[in-house]
Amino acid sequence: VANISDINAMGAVATSLVVGMVLPTDTTVGWVLEFADGLAAECDVVGAAVIGGDLSGGEQLVLSATVLGDLEGRSPIRRSGARAGDVVAVCGRLGWAQAGVSILRRGFKAPRVLVNAHRSANPPYDAGPRAAAAGATAMIDTSDGLVADLGHIARASGVSIVLESDRFEIAEELASAASALNVDPLTWVLAGGEDHSLAATFPPGQDLPEGFIEIGTVTEPLASPVVLVDGHMRPDLQGYDHFR
């Protein structure tokens, strides 16, 4: 899912995968077959196929996938193309996977729709190519959290991004779960990852592709490239750090 979504975020269509597996001696055939079935099911969603890879034995289970894609003649959409005045928009669910994690950590198993969002993401795979065709200037998969990933765009583009919290629609499922756990649902939306939604910037006045919702604007850098929420820094919304 993560690899395909990253291809999507550059405006490309995933076409094929190569998969490497290191399997401990106690790995069962049944587990391998279930893994293969899940991989095939996700490939079917985007019309891709596993075209090769490698198998090896080892002490620990290791899985590695590389996805190849087709830009269909378009230029890749990078993180470095956002310009002051651009509109910031997002497509896909935000905060659902993080809500599912929070529910499980508190010892609950419901609402199932949120728990399942954590266990099985549902990315908007077709949104990347549509955004590219509509003139997106920068784009990123938000697997590490919306604010954190928009920070990558801000730094790569040398700009700042200002988000407006009242533009986010909090789904009833999120609101109910947040109330039960005494959590601000906006924190899940802004900092939670693993939903694999897409965030993109578009030129001002550009019609947004279907499914994209405007959530903020790109500005000239404010001292340094940063992401602000309602004009304020939010250090509590750091998202996931791969090296921390």
Regions found by a protein language model. Give the residues of each.
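Short, compositionally biased
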Residues: 98-112
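Active-site cofactor/substrate anionic-group-binding motifs, chiefly glycine-
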Residues: 1-10
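Short beta-strand-to-turn element immediately C-terminal to the catalytic PLP-Schiff-base lysine
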Residues: 68-69, 91, 102-105, 201-202, ...
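Glycine-rich anion-binding loops of enzyme active sites
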Residues: 13-102
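A short, charged helix-loop
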Residues: 108-122
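Glycine-/charge-enriched secondary-structure boundary and capping motifs
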Residues: 25-49, 56-63, 133-134, 139-244
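A short, acidic/glycine-rich surface segment
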Residues: 5, 73-76, 185
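Internal active-site segments that recognize and position negatively charged phosphoryl groups
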Residues: 83-92, 120-146
